[in-house]
């Protein structure tokens, strides 16, 4: 992301277009670089550009532009555990969930999920290539590494079990099937003994999957300041989910759109006031 003389007040941004042709954009002393590549892309680009842990970058032979040990740290995601039930009658999904229309209606699948919102567990992002921005980075979220997250998952799975025991769920049981409580599961079934913490904890760990609510890597107060400027670097901001230490309980899209509009108006106001 940086090229040439870094401290001279001018920055070059190298990018490629859809045809693979490289271009160089020159940012003047009153301009800014706004990085909004998301919780995965923004810390990756900073590391590739030489902004990160000095020891880590040096181990990859990446020239250190600015030592910032928290880039790529505190990566988190809202973990999800779900059950999939095979049911014997056509089941109409929400239109928002339809990916394609199948020609066969022999089997219907119902999915019920529980989510651990605002996890305390976090991990890190590392580069898989020290030169290629298109190379997928290595990310570990360390789901349930904090005992509090695992405890919340156990409570959520038990809530799923309580719901499965209600009369309203009887219609989803598979006639003549002697499986777990009369239900046919696609994939792992709920633990047979919900009162056993160890069994439910094992279930949480073995069935966890992502909700694609990635955040962290460029946290406010650790990598960027309250105005989302990268601390120690002039004219560079990160404005996306990588700055969040916690996400809202639902899909973060609206929150991120709000952040973009808020920061856009704020930067325009700052520029008018500086003229």
What are these regions (language model features)?
Residues 114-126, 215-237:
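FAD-binding beta-loop-beta segment adjacent to the flavin cofactor pocket
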Residues 19-21, 144-151, 249-254:
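Conserved, non-catalytic sequence blocks in retroelement Pol enzymes and Pol-derived host proteins
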Residues 43-118, 129, 146-198, 202-214, ...:
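Mid-to-C-terminal "cap/lid" subdomains and adjacent gly/pro-rich loops that border
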Residues 232-248:
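Short FAD-binding loop at a beta-strand-to-alpha-helix junction that anchors the flavin cofactor
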Residues 17, 37-38, 49:
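Glycine-rich, N-terminal phosphate-binding loop of Rossmann-like dinucleotide-binding domains
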Residues 246-265:
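A conserved FAD-binding loop/helix module that cradles the flavin
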Residues 19-32, 36:
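Core beta-strand elements of the Rossmann-like FAD/NAD(P) dinucleotide-binding domain
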Residues 1-19, 73:
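A conserved short coil-to-beta-strand element within the FAD-binding core of flavoproteins
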